[in-house]
From Swiss-Prot:
It is an enzyme of class 2 (transferase). GO terms for biological process: lipoate biosynthetic process; protein modification process. Its EC number is 2.3.1.204. It catalyses: N(6)-octanoyl-L-lysyl-[glycine-cleavage complex H protein] + L-lysyl-[lipoyl-carrier protein] = N(6)-octanoyl-L-lysyl-[lipoyl-carrier protein] + L-lysyl-[glycine-cleavage complex H protein]. Residues 41-247 form the BPL/LPL catalytic domain. Catalyzes the amidotransfer (transamidation) of the octanoyl moiety from octanoyl-GcvH to the lipoyl domain of the E2 subunit of lipoate-dependent enzymes. The gene is lipL. SUPFAM superfamilies: Class II aaRS and biotin synthetases. This is Octanoyl-[GcvH]:protein N-octanoyltransferase. The keyword Translocase does not apply. The record marks 158 as: Lowers pKa of active site Cys. Keywords: Acyltransferase, Transferase. Pathway: Protein modification; protein lipoylation via endogenous pathway; protein N(6)-(lipoyl)lysine from octanoyl-[acyl-carrier-protein].
Amino acid sequence: MDLATKYFNQINWRYVDHSSGLEPMQSFAFDDTFSESVGKDLSCNVVRTWIHQHTVILGIHDSRLPFLSDGIRFLTDEQGYNAIVRNSGGLGVVLDQGILNISLIFKGQTETTIDEAFTVMYLLISKMFEDEDVSIDTKEIEQSYCPGKFDLSINDKKFAGISQRRVRGGIAVQIYLCIEGSGSERALMMQQFYQRALKGQTTKFHYPDIDPSCMASLETLLNREIKVQDVMFLLLYALKDLGANLNMDPITEDEWTRYEGYYDKMLERNAKINEKLDF
């Protein structure tokens, strides 16, 4: 059975639209909540869309930068961005109103390989943009921010990055799609963040040597105006074309209770990071 059939054809998917009104830490808590729901057969698969105001989501490795305080001051004081540490992935990414995040959450244990889970997202994104005269590649764009094996690029310019997190039998595959504005300007900001946070110091972990020119938005790559809202419609059309059965079942009382626990963990993680910073 091919992956498109396995994950989408006549498969129930619950659509959760969180494109406004949430803080980033709430988003990561919701994905953990839904992962547990799916893993315990309390929910069908979940597809969630989320958009946030100017925030840099730092990874676990970023929290160990030698001059992290200086890097965060640059983001907050000079660029007007908030900064938080997430619970998945190793390095920082940029979120703002021109970036759409999509989470695909489905059941899976060790039998579902990391590559298979990533490929499910790639299949969906490819379906969304199948009418465009472009080729979307999956390969690491080494000089991007948060580089990874499943970076999505067009003509070697990265416009999306994918991460995944596994919680209690559920797998959350998360993608950010840089749609509006300038991808290279966002990359320039991250380049300057690492310069401030490293100050040339040698570290055991190799942080990305960012070249802003290797990142771009879909607006730039497709050479036409395209809005986040347009891509949200493309997502729903693609799911239907792949044969998915969509519903919008509300969040249950049990999920709200579990969400509060996961949100508290996110708050605790970030409070510990803030304690270490000399603000």
